[in-house]
Amino acid sequence: MINLSIKSLWNRWIKLLKSFNKLPAYIDLRYGNDNKYKPHTLWYPPTFHSSLGVAEAIGGERIVPVFLMNTILSTFILITVYFVINSLFGFLPAILSSLLIIFSPRDFMPFLWGQWPERFAYAFVPLILYFFYKYFITYSKGAKKPAYLYITALLLGINILIHPLAFFHSLAGLAVLYVLLLIKQKKFVFNLKHIGVSITIFIILFMLFPFQTFNIFA
């Protein structure tokens, strides 16, 4: 008889994480203690590196698919910035913002070196701020659309699974944006139900790789 209790499923998930996150000996020798919460395991969530591994498996080699994936992710940063700024401020600010990012080492060095996965996490920051902005504006006008806030929570969860630095910068950006919108709209936006669902979405994503996400606070 299959035991589908929550405790049983949790134990199976933990066993899977241990087998998936355990560092090989040649990496553990140098990085074994980098994860303060769970030593000898990956210190970052495997989201970014797994995408490179999938690209290598599909491409059939180890070099070109990695750089191709980095190219796609670097381009994604430009695209998100352009469309978000264009929707808020128009074409000229959007094209100028994207053009400036092209010449930023934070964007082209991952493409050239294949490093710094946290830089790709910043592609989600404009989207996070945009969807929260849409939620605040629609809510303040009486047209409650919690889907915007749920998408914000989803993107925050994805963000922390790529790199925690971008996640904390996203939180700081949300705090500043909330204050500015509060002053502009002169309306306090708070809905316990919407916030509760959003927190649940975030926690589900946060707990996918607890060894790594809890390392943030270790």
Each PLM stretch: what is its role?
Residues 1-218:
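Membrane-embedded transmembrane-helix bundle of lipid-linked glycan/lipid transferases
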